[in-house]
Design a protein with these regions (language model features):
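Extreme N-terminal starter segment of soluble prokaryotic enzymes
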Residues: 1-3
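Conserved short alpha-helix immediately C-terminal to the canonical SAM/SAH-binding motif I
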Residues: 101, 125-128
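Conserved catalytic-core motifs of GNAT/GCN5-like acyltransferases
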Residues: 118-122, 129, 133, 138-154
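Conserved G/P- and acidic residue-centered "switch" motifs that form tight phosphate/ATP-binding loops
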Residues: 96-98
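Short amphipathic helical patch at the helix-1/turn junction of helix-turn-helix
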Residues: 88, 122-123
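A generic structural signal for beta-strand entry/edge sites
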Residues: 78-80, 116, 152
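Acetyl-CoA-dependent GNAT
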Residues: 5-11, 15-91, 102-108, 112, ...
Length: 162
């Protein structure tokens, strides 16, 4: 199992993985194109390309020629990076691959000199929150955005001294 930097030409492949990985979340929380048009379950290659144009770096997890997941890292400030689009295909879950992707971007953020990594999740997704807590993240705050049908929980993890 390898994790490598994704290229812009792989945006369609990344979008396919993201859509497939987030489909169950959309179904569980009733998220549709009408209620949550920017939810990752609706991700397109154009979205991934625009993110890359803004400086978001994507990483692809592969087992030989078969991709099993991806993750993105955005440098928000010199001290803070955002972990985004963590996606593991359903048939590859519960094998430690999500943690491997998170560990990879934590190391990349450290290499950039960041002091903290943050993420936003569906606040009602308790299992995901608990998983991030086990990885050393802590809840920062929960915010309700007018354009979203769910509250967002922001979580963060300090990088210095871990």
């Amino acid at each position: 199992m390898a994790i490598r930097l994704a290229t812009r030409e792989e945006a369609p492949r990344l979008a396919d993985i993201i859509r497939a990985a987030f489909r169950d979340v959309a179904e569980r929380f009733g998220l549709t194109a009408e209620t949550a048009p920017t939810h990752p379950s609706l991700c397109t290659a154009a979205w991934v390309g625009r993110a890359m144009d803004k400086g978001v770096t994507y990483y692809l997890g592969e087992d030989g020629a078969r991709a099993w997941g991806c993750i993105a890292l955005e440098r928000a400030t010199p001290d803070v990076c955002y972990l985004e689009r963590l996606a593991v295909l359903p048939e590859f879950r519960r094998k430690g691959l999500g943690k491997a992707l998170v560990d990879h971007v934590l190391n990349e953020a450290r290499a950039l000199g960041a002091r903290r990594v943050e993420i936003g999740i569906v606040a009602a997704h308790r299992e995901l929150k608990d998983w991030y807590l086990r990885l050393g993240f802590r809840a920062i705050k929960t915010v309700r955005f007018e354009h979203l049908p769910f509250a967002v929980m922001f979580m963060g993890r300090a990088l210095q001294g871990d």
